[in-house]
Each structure stands twice: as structure tokens, then as C-alpha cells.
A protein has these predicted regions:
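Membrane-embedded transmembrane alpha-helical bundles that form the catalytic cores
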Residues: 1-478
Length: 479
């Protein structure tokens, strides 16, 4: 991952210095940010990725002005539909490519083998563009009834092409989010930004947390769980449980570690990002889980799929249908295999079940024990659903479940029993870590500035000593 490369460190350091030398010159600062966004996409991606994004930005710019210039809702809906079609084409081209080529050959047409790469960050800047188009459309509705040129010339949500390009290419969020709403971003882009020394300790903490989560925790857990998931028939039932539980931990550390890093990079430039995680494995039910996991995606699903379908205003059973549709679409967005659809549908069905129990007045009750049992049940369900997320092929997921059933009678060794017990203890103590980041920030405040480089240097040396060879890419960068 290029965030951990020496090249990125050098380039970002030079950009950081130049960026803050321009403080007070907002237009120059924003221009430099735009240049850096595209330079990163080009240098660490490809010219192809940068060109696709540039063309996409031009389309969104034209579409936003078309939306602002007319009272017809169809223009807004058509623009969003084209964004979704563009995303679907690139994301699912590989799925229908072979069938399409075979169909052409059936009719005697010779076609060259064509491969189209999924542009880096396409999903996240597509979602961001939808929030922008909707903001323009909603602002136009507010201005309805004004003079005919009001909408075109004074729509408060319309942005210049350079500003829109900065938003869609913003390097901290382009790879794997968080999905930043346009209003949230542009309010910061239009404000004069100053370096605030009080943020330094938070930035350091976020960087350290991100590095530890990704480089140490996620990578070491992956080294343990990946062989188990790759060859489930070779392991007993407890080891298989440890493998899939390990994947749950790996995915969280990997993704939340990424978010910590990009939040630090954004804060270094004077921007704050929306929260994306809030101790998700503390959740007592699936609704609580989705209020804590990938928050920017779950709120996007709520506001741009679930509520437009009808939300909770169409009666109980239609509401449950909308929940199921929304989460199934979320699964399809993650990937083009049946497994991702199953993963999304499982979460949708789980929420329907939860809502049905609540409608009947049933539940585990209150109290510490009931809360802990609810946490365990939620974590186990989420982990079971991850089984269809981590395997691309449905047969592999079924093979894992089959191996688990076949190997139940195999003897369990002391090693895996101790690991399972330790994992249970860590899970039980997990809520105690809710204020860990805040505590680290406060601790850094207590360290004299003259000693702080020595302390941080020692911490980084320890991380360097214990870090494994090779750092895998962030998992969500593939979506």
C-alpha cells in the first residue's frame, strides 16, 4: 500500500510544507491540493485512472448545471442513473465480458480480447458525486418560485469545476472512503485553513493507531487465519472458528486502521473526515452494528436507497422489504459474485428478524449479562456473514461449512484451546478500550515537546522491529 512507501512519505512531506507556506492564500492552497490529488492518483495508480476521474468530473459538472437549470426531476434522476450505470459497467464488466464475447462469436463476429481495469476509487467518488447532485437538486427545489435565472446563477450548492475536481479526487478518501457528503466537504474547502498545533497530538495518535492496526494486528492475524481459510479440511472445528473469527478481527483492524491514517492525513491539511467506526464489535444487535460499522456507507444506504424506496412510511412489512432490498444492493456493490449478495441479504434478513422480534415485544432484556450475551450473538452472526464476504466463490464458503461439520469430532489441541480462551478474554475486555485513543492524546499532552520526538522514535522502532515482512493492500481498496 503506497501510504507506507518511502516515496509517498517524501512526496507528502514536500507537499505539506508547500501547502502550509500558502496559508492565507486559499485559492493557491486549493489549487496545490488539486494538483497533488491527481499527482498521487497518476504516480501511484496510472494515467488511465486520472483520465477516467477527470472525464467523470466533467460529466458531473455538466450534470449539476443541467439539474440547476431545469425544474424537471427527470434530469436529476437521469444523471444519477448514468453515474450508477458507469459504476456498474466498470465494476461488473469482467462478469459479463466472456458471455458477451461468446455471443458475438456465435454470430460469426471476431472480437479482440478486451480487459477494462476498475478505476481506483471509482465506487467512492461515484457515491460522493451522487451526494453532490442531490445537494444541487435540493437547493434548486428551495429556490423554486424565484425568478427564472435564480436557479442557474444563484444555486448555492453549485461549485466551480476546480472545487468539484478537488472534492472528487480528495486523496485521503478516494481509495476506500469514508464517503464524505458534499456539504460537509465544501464547507471546509471554502474556509481559510490554519495549522493548529493543538491537533498535532491527535494526528500523531491517529497515525500510530493506524500503523499498529494495519501493520501489526491485521497482518499478524491474517498470517494466522489465512492458511486456515485456504485449506479448511486440514483443521479441526475450533481452528476453523479461530480462522473465521480472525478474519473478523483482521477486516476491522485493516479498515479502521486505514480510516485512522486518512483522518490523520486530512487533519494535517486542515480537514476533518466524518466518523466511520465506533467500536462495532460492541454492538448488541445488527442495527447497533450498522450504527458503528462503516458509518458513512450505512448512512448512505439509509439516505439514498432505503428512504427513497419508502423508508418506514409504508407499513411494517413493506419497511422490512425495503431493508432487505437496501442491504442486498449493498452486497452487490461490494462485489459481482453470489457471495456478496448473500452477505448483504443475510444482514438484511437479520435486521428484518430483529424488527419482527421488537414488534412482538420479544428480546433478551436488559442487564449486564443480557448485554454481553447480545454482544456475543451479534458478533457470531456478523462473523458468520463474513464467511461469504471473505470467499469469492460460493463453493468455498460451503466447503468451509462442510469442513466444520466433518471435523467436529477431531481432537482439539491445547494450543487452539488457549488461543480461543485468550480471544474470549480480549472480546470481554474490548469495551474497556473505548476511550483508548482519547487517553493516548491526553498522555501525549503530558510529554514535554523536547522529549516527544524521542518517545515517538522509540515507539516507531518497536513497531519496525515487530512488523512482519510485506504489508498487504487494504482490503476495502478493492471495492
Amino acid at each position: 500500500m503506497f501510504f507506507f512507501s518511502i516515496e509517498f512519505g517524501i512526496i507528502f512531506a514536500l507537499f505539506f510544507i508547500a501547502y502550509w507556506l500558502l496559508r492565507g492564500f486559499l485559492r493557491l492552497q486549493n489549487s496545490l491540493l488539486l494538483l497533488f490529488n491527481y499527482a498521487i492518483l497518476w504516480y501511484f495508480g496510472s494515467l488511465y485512472f486520472a483520465l477516467v476521474l477527470a472525464l467523470f468530473t466533467l460529466f458531473i459538472f455538466a450534470a449539476s448545471h443541467a439539474i440547476a437549470a431545469t425544474d424537471r426531476k427527470s434530469v436529476f434522476l437521469a444523471s444519477v442513473a448514468l453515474v450508477v450505470c458507469n459504476l456498474s459497467f466498470f465494476k461488473y464488466f469482467a462478469s459479463f465480458k466472456d458471455g458477451f464475447e461468446n455471443l458475438l462469436r456465435f454470430f460469426g463476429l471476431d472480437v479482440a480480447d478486451i480487459d477494462i481495469l476498475l478505476p481506483l476509487g471509482l465506487s467512492f467518488y461515484s457515491f460522493a458525486s451522487i451526494t453532490y447532485l442531490r445537494a444541487v437538486y435540493e437547493a434548486k427545489r428551495v429556490g423554486k418560485g424565484a425568478p427564472s435565472d435564480y436557479v442557474l446563477l444563484q444555486n448555492p450548492k453549485l461549485e466551480s469545476l476546480p472545487n468539484l475536481a478537488i472534492y472528487l479526487s480528495f486523496f485521503p478518501t478516494i481509495i476506500a472512503g469514508p464517503i464524505m457528503r458534499s456539504d460537509f466537504f465544501f464547507a471546509q474547502l471554502h474556509s481559510v485553513r490554519f495549522w493548529r498545533a493543538k491537533f498535532a497530538n491527535l494526528i500523531i495518535t491517529l497515525l500510530l493507531f493506524g500503523i499498529v492496526k494495519k501493520v501489526l494486528l491485521a497482518t499478524y492475524v491474517q498470517e494466522y487465519s489465512e492458511p486456515i481459510l485456504r485449506n479448511p479440511l486440514n483443521y479441526n472445528a475450533i481452528e476453523l472458528l479461530l480462522g473465521i473469527f480472525g478474519y473478523s478481527v483482521q477486516l476491522y483492524c485493516d479498515f479502521s486502521g486505514y480510516v485512522d491514517l486518512v483522518c490523520a492525513f486530512a487533519l494535517m491539511l486542515g480537514f476533518t473526515l466524518p466518523p466511520n467506526f465506533n467500536m462495532p464489535y460492541m454492538a448488541r444487535n445488527l442495527k447497533d452494528f450498522w450504527a458503528r460499522w462503516h458509518i458513512s456507507l450505512s448512512t448512505f444506504i439509509r439516505d439514498y436507497i432505503y428512504i427513497p424506496l419508502g423508508g418506514s412510511k409504508r407499513g411494517f412489512w413493506l419497511t422490512q422489504l425495503f431493508v432487505l432490498i437496501a442491504f442486498s444492493l449493498s452486497g452487490i456493490w461490494h462485489g459481482n459474485t453470489i457471495n456478496f449478495l448473500i452477505w448483504g441479504a443475510l444482514h438484511g434478513l437479520g435486521l428484518v428478524w430483529l424488527n419482527s422480534l421488537r414488534a412482538l415485544g420479544l428480546g433478551l432484556g436488559s442487564g449486564a449479562l443480557a448485554g454481553f450475551v447480545a454482544r456475543v450473538c451479534t458478533f457470531c452472526f456478523v462473523t458468520f456473514a463474513w464467511l461469504f464476504f471473505c470467499y469469492k466463490d460460493f463453493g468455498d464458503s460451503v466447503g468451509f461449512l462442510g469442513a466444520f461439520g466433518e471435523n467436529l469430532a477431531q481432537p482439539v489441541g491445547l494450543r487452539e484451546s488457549v488461543i480461543l480462551l485468550c480471544g474470549f478474554v480480549v472480546f470481554s475486555c474490548y469495551p474497556l478500550l473505548r476511550n483508548l485513543q482519547r487517553m493516548c492524546v491526553l498522555y501525549l499532552y503530558k510529554i514535554p515537546n523536547i522529549l516527544k520526538p524521542l518517545v515517538l522514535g522509540a515507539i516507531l522502532c518497536v513497531i519496525f522491529v515487530f512488523m512482519p515482512d510485506g504489508i498487504p493492500n487494504f482490503i476495502y481498496a478493492g471495492f
